[in-house]
Each structure stands twice: as structure tokens, then as C-alpha cells.
A protein has these predicted regions:
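N-terminal Rossmann-like NAD(P)+-binding subdomain of aldehyde/semialdehyde dehydrogenases
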Residues: 1-125
């Protein structure tokens, strides 16, 4: 059985029941399923504006930069897995480079700018 792709919304994973089958552009085999559950966008907005905002405000700019750097490192360590998944969309490795390496590089760049250009604390004066 293929994996059901879930959505992380309002602090929890949503999507247990399979819906649309997703097929590989390489060989036509089933690779995953989209989930059947509806997403509650009002709940997502509320969560972001309350819980998410409080979480961000609890971190200073340097901590946020470190979180971006950690995410970039995590993704970079798994780039070959991401390339393998991306191939099933019909994209070549070069096509996927912009998203995978480019996205990771952008996270590292933002982390570096935040670490070097933003002050400690969470206010800019």
C-alpha cells in the first residue's frame, strides 16, 4: 500500500484516508495517495495567529536564524531522497536543482543574513 500524503495543519497531521492515487511519470506506478480529508483554513489561520505567533515571538532573531539554518542543514542532508521523489514528477535532476539546492541555499542565505544583520532580541530599532 502506498503512503497517504498528509498535511501538517494547526499543530497536527491531517489526512488518514486515501483519496486520489498519484502515479509516477517515469513508469506509471502508484507512488502515493492524496488524502481525502478537508482542511479547515479558519482553524489554520487561528492557529498561526495565536500559537504560531507566540512561538515566533518567544524566539529572538538569532534563534530564528538558527532554526532556518537547522532546517536548511536537515534538507541538505536528505537532498538525494528529494531528488528521487522529484524524479517521479517527470522532472530531471537539473529541473529539480532549482527547488532542492536553490531552496536549501535560500534558507542558508536568509539564516546568514539574519545572524549577521539583525540584532539580538526580537525588535528592530
Amino acid at each position: 500500500m502506498s503512503t497517504v500524503l498528509q498535511s501538517f495543519v494547526a499543530g497536527r497531521w491531517v489526512g488518514q484516508q486515501s483519496a486520489q492515487a498519484l502515479h509516477s511519470a517515469i513508469n506509471g506506478k502508484e507512488v502515493a495517495f492524496a488524502h481525502a480529508e478537508s482542511l479547515d483554513f479558519a482553524e489554520a489561520l487561528h492557529y498561526g495567529r495565536t500559537t504560531g505567533l507566540q512561538g515566533m515571538l518567544a524566539m529572538d532573531f538569532q534563534q530564528r536564524a538558527a532554526a532556518l539554518r537547522a532546517l536548511a542543514k536537515y534538507l541538505g542532508e536528505r537532498k538525494e531522497e528529494l531528488y528521487a521523489i522529484s524524479a517521479h514528477t517527470g522532472a530531471t535532476r537539473i529541473d529539480s536543482w532549482v527547488d532542492i539546492e536553490g531552496g536549501t541555499g535560500t534558507l542558508f542565505a536568509y539564516a546568514g543574513m539574519a545572524a549577521s544583520e539583525l540584532p539580538s532580541g526580537n525588535l528592530i530599532h
